[in-house]
Curated annotation (Swiss-Prot):
Catalytic activity: L-seryl-[protein] + ATP = O-phospho-L-seryl-[protein] + ADP + H(+); L-threonyl-[protein] + ATP = O-phospho-L-threonyl-[protein] + ADP + H(+)
UniProt entry tagged with the keyword ATP-binding: yes
Domain of life: Bacteria
Xref: Pfam families: Pkinase
Protein name per its UniProtKB record: Serine/threonine-protein kinase YabT
Domain Protein kinase residues, every copy: 28-286
Compositionally biased tracts (Basic residues): 289-309
Species assigned in the record: Bacillus subtilis (strain 168)
Taxonomy of the source species: Bacteria, Bacillati, Bacillota, Bacilli, Bacillales
Length: 338
């Protein structure tokens, strides 16, 4: 929820407003508001080089913290997770009679995660989560925990499909207290642990994102939250395939994102193998008997054309081809894009 100062600032920064940096002198023309949070507002802005996403805030410390996170992403060569960083500066807004801090970053275009899954199908959920775990692994190795990990902060770009994060406001140094979180994806809310910034905190959120992606809505916890989540996982065919990874993530058993990723990959491969039907052995062809000609008469052997295979055989082969193509595409996504 925004404070009063940010609410006033949002009213002042309308489409068409131009912001000029005090120190670097770069100019940004606001086109529309993309989102807002507890510590700032994000706009689509236009520059001489194209479009950027511009985050504006009256809290210079929060801007500095987020800039450090984006720079860390770049150093770790993990820009595929978060947006690329371009510029940071201060500016004076005459219409609001206030000084603001801002930073410019890559404008990431694409549908939000839940929209993408709704359009393309639930089979994309594990593929995208495996990609997310790859990015989280790099982030954690740099000493950062994403914190406020949720579908509203995840966009799918492409083709080829690639999951990206669009808000690093909750990213926290490992070992500290998580500074921003959303209850539904927070392990403290569900009674599974503390809000200490550590890899297992993010992995709990990944499990909740998978549950939310399947059930398509957030829900309130009951008086038995752990049993509630267990029932939701075991009661859904897709989630059940990955229940080992999901239960381990919920219980905080993983020490790294790579461990969860391995279990997800193993579960996906087992599910793909179970889908492939076993091809029946072909029946040996029976030779057509030739009638022995009677003596004194020449008997022509009648030619009998081979019977066409039944339609069910063609359907079987078509099904096998489709499954093989899907398996190859799944492997392509995992081994070439992750």
């Amino acid at each position: 929820m925004m404070n009063d100062a940010l609410t006033s600032l949002a009213c002042s920064l309308k489409p068409g407003t131009t912001i000029k940096g005090k120190w670097n002198g770069n100019t940004y023309t606001l086109r529309k508001q993309l989102g807002k949070g507890a510590n700032g507002i994000v706009y689509l802005a236009e520059t001489s080089d194209g479009h950027v996403a511009l985050k504006v805030s009256d809290d210079s410390l929060s801007i500095t913290s987020e800039v450090n996170v984006l720079k860390s992403f770049s150093k770790a060569q993990s820009v595929t997770m978060g947006p690329s960083f371009f510029d940071t500066d201060d500016a004076y807004i005459p219409s609001a009679n206030t000084k603001v801090s801002f930073y410019a970053m890559e404008y990431i275009k694409g549908p939000l995660l839940l929209k993408y899954v709704s359009d393309k199908g639930a089979e994309w959920i594990p593929v995208l989560m495996i990609q997310l775990l790859s990015s989280l692994s790099v982030l954690h190795q740099q000493g950062w925990i994403f914190g406020d990990l949720k579908p509203d902060n995840l966009i799918v770009t492409g083709p080829p499909a690639r999951i990206r994060c669009i808000d690093v406001g909750g990213t926290t140094k490992e070992g500290r207290a998580i500074k921003e979180y959303t209850e539904f994806y927070d392990r403290g809310y569900w009674g599974y642990g503390t809000r200490k910034a550590e890899p297992s905190y993010d992995l709990f959120a990944v499990a909740m994102i998978m549950i939310n992606s399947v059930h398509k809505k957030e829900f309130k916890k009951t008086n038995q939250p752990k049993e509630q989540l267990r029932s939701l996982i075991e009661g859904n065919p897709l989630l059940q395939k990955y229940k080992k990874a999901l239960f381990s993530a919920l219980n905080g058993d993983y020490q790294s994102a790579d461990e969860m990723k391995k279990d997800m990959l193993d579960a996906g491969q087992k599910a793909a193998q179970r889908k492939q039907p076993i091809k029946a052995s072909p029946q040996p062809a029976t030779r057509q008997r030739q009638q022995k000609p009677r003596q004194g008469k020449i008997t022509k052997t009648r030619y009998t054309p081979k019977q066409k295979p039944a339609k069910s055989g063609g359907l079987f082969e078509t099904t096998l081809i489709v499954i093989s193509v899907l398996a190859l595409y799944f492997a392509y996504i995992i081994f070439f894009l992750i």
